[in-house]
Amino acid sequence: MALELLAIDLGKRAFHIYGIDTDGVILSRKVSRAKLAEVVGDLEPTAIAMEACASAHYWARCWLAAGREVRLINPRFVKPFVKGSKNDAVDAEAIFEAAMRPTMRFVPVKSTDQQDLQSLHRARDRLICQRTALINHTRGLLAEYGVVLPQGPWRFMAQAPTAIAGADLSDLARAIFGELMGQLDDLDRRIQKLDAMIVTLCRTNETCRRLAKLPGVGPIIATAIVGSVNDGRQFRSGREMAAWIGLVPRQYTTGGKPRLGGIGRRANHYLRRQLIHGARHRQPVGQA
């Protein structure tokens, strides 16, 4: 079959492909993971469309290496084209229809370096969440023994050992809190190790070094931006990028009457959070 466009509904073990050849014959079939590359190679489509979901960037790099055009679509833009109940075949057809729209916006394919950066940031964020949860857990247990510590992870880590040593605790309680503080120290060392890796990567990447010169931007924000948008060529202006991150007001305009609400809060939640933290650090809240 001569296919100009092939849509693939991605999965872990089972995939569904959908396409229409030049004679109008519809191709819709289920393909196993082991056979996907072989089947796509036999069909030789000019372009391949997929949702920008789990493993999409891996497969996109595979198809690009094989000389195919790749169109990654935000799942939110595919949903309006789903007809009837959801299943793999319907999803693949919806991806095909969405990819054919002349005004459709596509997601740039991430390189392995970008995905490495994103994985590093996600691992660091997970460790920070675990540390915060453990601090709150330890703080709550200490309060049951009359030990109240100030807010903030750094003040907690600095004052907790002294407070525990001076508290009237049983041997068992001291052993419990010693174990919890040991876990906190281990998490802190792991976070510092990942921080050092981020600083090293920032120094070796030209785009990161340029971004780090901006006010309120350091290695963490610079590498997070590069990991998410690379050099930003997909945006026509800085405002477009701000809208993509979700930093501009949500708009609901009808009948010629504009309505603006709070920030959109869509897209990359992690990047938006880091940028807001950087802005607050540069200009603390309440200071003009």
What are these regions (language model features)?
Residues M1-A288:
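A detector of single, family-specific signature residues
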